[in-house]
Every structure is written in C-alpha cells, then in structure tokens.
Amino acid sequence: MDITIQHPWFKRALGPLIPSRLFDQFFGEGLLEYDLLPLFSSTISPYYRQSLFRSVLESGISEVRSDREKFTIMLDVKHFSPEDLSVKIIDDFVEIHGKHSERQDDHGYISREFHRRYRLPSNVDQSAITCSLSSDGMLTFSGPKVQANMDPSHSERPIPVSREEKPTSAPSS
C-alpha cells in the first residue's frame, strides 16, 4: 500500500474541507485505517474518500443557535459525566469546563479536559437559563431572550400601586 507523504508547508487544494485529526477530541487515540489512505483512493473512485468528514462529526460538535426567542448552545460532551462538568455564567460569558481523571480505554490510559467560553447576547434573560445533559452526551444550554428592542436602562416597566390604611404625614414647609 502506498502512503502519500506531504511536506508540512505543502497546502492541499481541499485544505479546509479535509479535517485534521490533530486538534479534534480523538487526538492520541490511535490512527484509523482511513487515516493512512491517500486523499483520493483510486481503488474505489478518484473522487471518493471513505469517512471524509467522520472526524469532524465525531470530534465534539459545538453548535450555537441564536434566534428571536432563545439562545442555545449544544455541545457534545459524551466522554464526561455530569460530575465532570462545570457550567458558569461570568459577566456576559458562559464558561463550560469538563475534566475527567485518567482512565483506561481501548488504546491505553487517557485523561481529558476542555474549556469553552461563549459570549451571551445582551438580550438573554440570565435568570431563566437552563442547562441539561442528554443520555447521548449532548449538553444543551439555553436561555430565553427578552424583546430585542427593549433597552433595560430605558424600558418602560409598570409599577403596581398598593393601598395603605394609614395616612402619609404631610411634609413640613
């Protein structure tokens, strides 16, 4: 089997389309068979590479959605248990930190740690933010948005009028 060797300064024509495993969450877990195949394997087709985007889809997807009603962050944390995760709001940022100690897997021993920081939009109601972890390892952080045209410093807010039974003393002049 021929292995293509490329110099580090050589830029591939499809550079951003072909993901590098160096920076994904599977770094250090061993090479897979398709990692050793040349970019375009001529045995199948000159334009086909098996599992071209596999490492992108399985390396811990982070998705941020912001629409009119809510702001949502979805993060793949399948290698972490809820006890390994910490989610905090600091000023206008969401900080998500995950760390687990060294444990054995198929390739030896591994420990993982990540730290992600996202800016919260100014119109997110921080008091109503929720965070949940699904059974398949997706962490979902979401918060509703207040009206987009509302400026907290200049917004109109109704003040309730309450009735008291005793009279107010008149100010002396």
UniProtKB/Swiss-Prot annotation:
GO molecular function: metal ion binding; structural constituent of eye lens; unfolded protein binding
Entry's transmembrane regions: none
Region (Disordered): 142-173
Binding sites annotated in the UniProt record for Zn(2+) 2: H107
Entry GO CC: cytoplasm; nucleus
Tagged with keyword Nucleus: yes
PTM-bearing positions, type N-acetylmethionine: M1
Biased composition (Basic and acidic residues): 153-167
Origin: domain of life: Eukaryota
Subcellular location: Cytoplasm; Nucleus
KW Zinc (keyword) present: yes
Glycosylation-annotated residues: S162
Positions with a binding annotation for Zn(2+) 1: H100, E102
Sites where the protein binds Zn(2+) 3: H154
One Pfam family matching this protein: Crystallin
Family under the similarity heading: Belongs to the small heat shock protein (HSP20) family.
Record note on quaternary structure: Heteropolymer composed of three CRYAA and one CRYAB subunits. Inter-subunit bridging via zinc ions enhances stability, which is crucial as there is no protein turn over in the lens. Can also form homodimers and homotetramers (dimers of dimers) which serve as the building blocks of homooligomers. Within homooligomers, the zinc-binding motif is created from residues of 3 different molecules. His-100 and Glu-102 from one molecule are ligands of the zinc ion, and His-107 and His-154 residues from additional molecules complete the site with tetrahedral coordination geometry.
Name of the protein in its database record: Alpha-crystallin A chain
Originating organism: Rhea americana
